[in-house]
Amino acid sequence: MNKKNYSHSYKLCAGIAFAACTLLTWSCADHYDGDEEWSPQKQNSTLLSPEAEGIKVVASPDGSSMTISWPVVYGAGGYAAFLYNVNDPDSPVLVKSDSIDGCSFNATREEDTNYMLKIRTLGNVKYNNKEAQEETVFNFNTFLPTFKEIPNGTDLTTWFGEAGNLPEDSTSHLCYDLEPGGTYTLSGNIDFGGHQVTLRSSSKSFNAKLTIGSGAKLQTWGGFTLKYLDIDCAQTNKALVELSTTPDDSIKNLVGTANYYFIQDPIVFQGCKVSSLNGALIADGEGGKYVVRTLMINDCIVEIINTSLIPISLRTGSYVTDFTVKNSTIYSLEKNTAAFLQYNGRPKELNDDSEKQCISFLNSTLYQLSYNANFRGDTRTQGQKSNYFTVERCIIVDCGKDNFCQSLLRQASTNPTVSYSKNTYWKDGEDKSANQTGAGCDQTGTALTTDPGFINPAAGNFTPTGSQQVEEKTGDPRWFNQ
């Protein structure tokens, strides 16, 4: 369902507003705590359900939950509320149902989701009030507001070259909607400059399709997000996303004096399927040294076809402060023998003890990456206390050297902060958990040792059949939801 069909959007409030709203959980059925008996204003009536105009949705500060409240209906005996996820309008999914003696309730909140609330006022036998004959239906969503919609069949390079589609003076987050299931092309480079830009399908459930032409790239020196897109890279060997060759000096030396350009807003790949990747997923080009504060690959499938490709290639002198791969599958059709990620910058150069470099792999499936090679190619940060590594609940097959952890850390040192839990280290048909030895490596004793037994990796099916992996549901969770 296209989010624009909804007439109401959620209101995001933080801190005090959220706390105040949660206090609305008192009983909204009329009552009086004094000594005298009290009667409600409404008796011997058929009640109405709360008016949609008075319903409010307030997100928690971290966005993980929300409080939904409505105006009191006098004489009510309570309310029956049903909250649905309607991303697929033909198959609503019940999120929460409750009979409530109050005028609010809490529910989990998902990003980029269409919701429908149905609420009915219940009767009150004591005062002979009957329940409402009709329920109130209230639609809302958790999408970032749309700046412009891009028609199906558009060449993005041509479209963004037209006046007004990328306003030079805008300081807002520019969110562009592509039609769900629509087809789009990128015939040449687009440099979004310092704009914070999101390109997305307007439906979380139905990706738009984007074909990258020969030599075409998406460039930025600001925050940038690709969401819910199927991206075909077969025609190009260039980086899908490249840090701009012409960054503005306004983002230079925000910390320290080492001439780094700082990208403060996140660069995100979310809900994307990237096929036939023959160039880097992201590279730093020739625009100077960058510090990318946040780089995230979340809920993605990335297929690599180049056996010498470095997918995360920041070799000009750049690095990422916080790099995370989460709920994703990244694989090579043939055994890739290059590093998976390469930085050539380091926090130490900023002369600030608070600067960190974090690398995390969470609930992800990695296959045939950096086979018999170092998973991380850089050595400039070896042995430094600024390093943080997290590998948890991942299935790692034919990646790195026999000691995968060492090929990731590139050091035998107690300096970095590390966290491991329930990973599979499988290589050349054998469990390699016993090889994860040395300072900083996985010695938690939590590794899973059964063959993950992917159903058909050659066809891109990484559903595990190994008993321990199935029991623990490790790796990319999508394979358990087929």
PLM segments and residue spans:
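Bacterial Sec-dependent N-terminal signal peptides
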Residues: M1-Y6, G15-V58
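Extracellular fibronectin type III
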Residues: A29-K42, G123-P145
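Conserved aromatic anchor
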Residues: G63-G75
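Beta-strand-rich modules
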Residues: N106-N128
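N-terminal extracellular ligand-recognition/capping segment immediately after the signal peptide
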Residues: G153-T157, S170-V197, S202-G213
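Extracellular beta-strand-rich solenoid/capping regions of secreted or surface-exposed proteins
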Residues: T185-T198, K209-I263
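Right-handed parallel beta-helix
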Residues: G222-C233, Y261-S276, V291-S308, Y319-N336, ...
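C-terminal accessory segments
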Residues: D442-Q482
